[in-house]
From Swiss-Prot:
The gene coding this protein: tma16
Major place of residence: nucleus
Species of provenance: Xenopus tropicalis (Western clawed frog)
InterPro entries listed in its UniProt record: Tma16, Tma16_sf
Biased composition (Acidic residues): 178-197
GO molecular function: preribosome binding
Assigned protein family: Belongs to the TMA16 family.
Localization of this protein: Nucleus
Record's GO cellular component terms: nucleus
Subunit field text: Associates with pre-60S ribosomal particles.
Protein name, per record: Translation machinery-associated protein 16
Claim: Nucleus is one of the keywords in the record: yes
Length: 197
């Protein structure tokens, strides 16, 4: 019977001593790759959450409006905060069926309630971040956005809180905001000039 030819492609790996420099190097590389993957996944998750929020706002904009007032922006945020109401009602209907002993979709219901609570706290606190629909130029850029995440930095964001809805004199607030926006735009331009050089 003929002998099988030795397989040259199969090479046995050398056993590495656990305390050697090579083992430490491989461990460092593995940790570095894990850290890169974790950061990449966290960034992708953050971008997808922001993308979903922006997509919701873009689909609920009034096409005839050239710019929104802060009061109208607050009304839009209120409808954004109630976006899960129909899903919560469906979950409640499923759970109210007679004979069911366990709650169905309990984890989804918990996630939705936590999200709504967190967003409501942001809105009543220092403000929830939405696309800048108060400024007509930024609103036009936002409407032209094609949901590409690479173009996300082009969209200007603004924090709006419930105190904007409760402000007594809208004219004073708007006049002050125009001056503030001019200062912010000049600061943005100076920062971009510094970054280019």
């Amino acid at each position: 019977m003929p002998k099988a030819p030795p397989n040259k492609n199969k090479q046995e790996k050398k056993v590495i001593h656990p305390y050697s420099r090579k083992a430490a190097q491989l461990t460092r590389e593995a940790h570095k790759q894990d850290r890169k993957d974790r950061l990449k996944n966290e960034k992708a998750l953050r971008l997808s959450i922001i993308g979903e929020k922006l997509q919701w706002f873009q689909s609920h904009l009034n096409p005839e409006k050239e710019e929104y007032t802060k009061k109208e922006a607050c009304e839009l945020i209120e409808s954004y905060l109630h976006r899960f109401d129909s899903e919560l009602e469906q979950i409640e209907l499923h759970n109210n069926i007679k004979g069911r002993q366990t709650r169905r979709h309990g984890s989804r219901e918990t996630v939705i309630k936590q999200t709504i609570e967190r967003e409501r706290q942001l809105y009543s606190g220092y403000g929830i971040e939405i696309p800048d629909i108060v400024n007509s130029k930024n609103l036009k850029v936002f409407r032209d956005w094609d949901l590409d995440m690479k173009k996300l930095p082009n969209i200007k964001m603004r924090k709006i809180s419930i105190s904007d809805l409760l402000s007594k004199s809208g004219k004073e607030v708007q006049g002050g905001n125009e001056e503030t926006e001019d200062k912010l735009e000049s600061n943005d331009e100076s920062l971009s000039d510094v970054q280019e050089s």
